[in-house]
Amino acid sequence: MLPNTGKLAGCTVFITGASRGIGKAIALKAAKDGANIVIAAKTTQRHPKLLGTIYTAAEEIEAAGGKALPCVVDVRDEQQINSAVEKAVERFGGIDILVNNASAISLTNTLETPTKRVDLMMSVNTRGTYLTSKACIPFLKKSKVAHILNLSPPLNLNPMWFKQHCAYTIAKYGMSMCVLGMAEEFRGEIAVNALWPRTAIHTAAMDMLGGAGVESQCRKVDIIADAAYSIFKRPKSFTGNFIIDENILKEEGIKDFDIYAITPGHPLLPDFFLDEHPDAVMEEKESYDPVPEVKEEKLQLQEQPQLQEQPQLQEKPQLQEQPQLQEKPQLQEQPQLQEQPQLQEQPQQQPQLQEQPQLQEKPQLQEQPQQQEKPQPQQQPQQQPQQRPQQRPQPQPQPQPLLQSVLPPKPHFGAVEETFRIVKDSLSDEVVRATQAVYQFELSGEDGGTWFLDLKSKGGKVGHGEPSDRADVVMSMATEDFVKMFSGKLKPTMAFMSGKLKIKGNIALAIKLEKLMTHMNSRL
């Protein structure tokens, strides 16, 4: 871990949400240098599930070598914020560092998020950060080591981070936008930065979100405390940065990050908002964004007669040069389409449409019978034999992948049933011995229902309804996402992080199922 250097001795650090978790860890790290800590948090009485109050935190800070000032602060209340700032200045003579750590979270989609919860997240995350910063800035400007640090993510506009928890993302990005604006506004006077973990951090909030056993996939709060300490040591010129904890600690010479793991060597859960796990992120993006749009574009070329009957598409020589396709607004507005050059080449190299079996893996496309008939692609070579003779082989039927049998046109229930059939065929006594778990799947949406996968009974069992033995893990998701997950198009980790998959029960056994899925993907 990062050693203390005494750099913060005598500095006053104002931390919101410092009674427990990450806020308290940062406070204790600074206290070891002899810093003055203002504990700005709500909790004054012990909670049966949430350990720690502003007073117990003050005792720990004093024991670590710092001086503590516990203040009752709800960051939604501007008067409480201003009162705490006044007390801090009166007690310690000023404020040198502000840590905006207080946060509210609800990983629910738009229709499932009550207005009251939306207001809470906006008020605590965005408004609370803004008001606390505003109250502290006049005093920070007088400090020689002035820092504002927001616990917020990089501004990543990948739609996957908005889709399943739009309100939370907006509220959290509001904190990040404070960094973006204030860093420039107070450049040369105050260093303003954001800090975000690469992996999940074990806190009370994570226990509530992930359930029992999630801690083994997390790192300790110490990694955030060390990263924050590294930032505080830097000059005011170090500003406007969106910092990942692991990256800045690597700069400090930390190489072994197992020291921060709750369970060293155990796979870690990636945190939200980071596209730093390319395989997982691309699988997730394909599961709802670029691939469906690509397929819709192709289906329009095949199914909408007006596109094929337009004489300019057949007669204009520009078709071979494809300026129109490159200039179409809808293609340019979709960055993911620009990343797939084969989309521009497909009118000349139509066989690529058949080389992408994943197009048939999407249930919504198979529900359109036109895709099976495909009369238009057979007519195109006849209409333009001189321009594209290479298209003549296109109508020849291609071998269908095994997934075609998993995804019948209708209904989704059939896809789920067929998926379980193939899963059953993939089981063995060896798999059962290695897993020893019963999984229950609560599938929502069209033709949803309850299914189970029993990997405790000899040979393994699958079926519709609840298992005979109590399930060790209950997974809730949409039927469509279930099929994608078992066919390898959607990784369980990313489904969980994006809110598509909800897990109750033993997380370690859920991870075992993910490994089993990887093994079965070759058959699915």
UniProtKB/Swiss-Prot annotation:
- Please give the residue positions where the record annotates the modification N6-(2-hydroxyisobutyryl)lysine: K42
Q: Name one GO cellular component term.
A: mitochondrion
The entry's function note states: Has apparently no steroid dehydrogenase activity. Controls bile acid (BA) and lipid metabolism in response to nutritional cues.
The segment annotated Disordered runs over 283-410
Respond yes or no to whether keyword Ribonucleoprotein is given for this record. no
Keyword annotations of the record: Acetylation, Hydroxylation, Mitochondrion, NADP, Oxidoreductase, Peroxisome
Which positions are tagged coiled coil?
A: none
What protein is this chain from? Hydroxysteroid dehydrogenase-like protein 2
Concerning InterPro entries, the annotation shows:
HSDL2, NAD(P)-bd_dom_sf, SCP2_sterol-bd_dom, SCP2_sterol-bd_dom_sf, SDR_fam
What SUPFAM superfamilies does this protein map onto? NAD(P)-binding Rossmann-fold domains, SCP-like
User: EC number(s) for this protein?
Assistant: 1.-.-.-
N6-succinyllysine: residues carrying this PTM: K424
In the UniProt record, the gene name given for this protein reads Hsdl2
Q: Mainly resides where?
A: other
Positions contributing to NADP(+) binding: G17, A18, S19, R20, G21, I22, G23, K42, D74, K172
Q: Which residues form the SCP2 domain?
A: 414-521
Q: What family name appears in the similarity comment?
A: Belongs to the short-chain dehydrogenases/reductases (SDR) family.
The processes (GO biological process) annotated in the record are: cholesterol homeostasis
Tell me the classification of the organism that encodes this protein: Eukaryota, Metazoa, Chordata, Craniata, Vertebrata
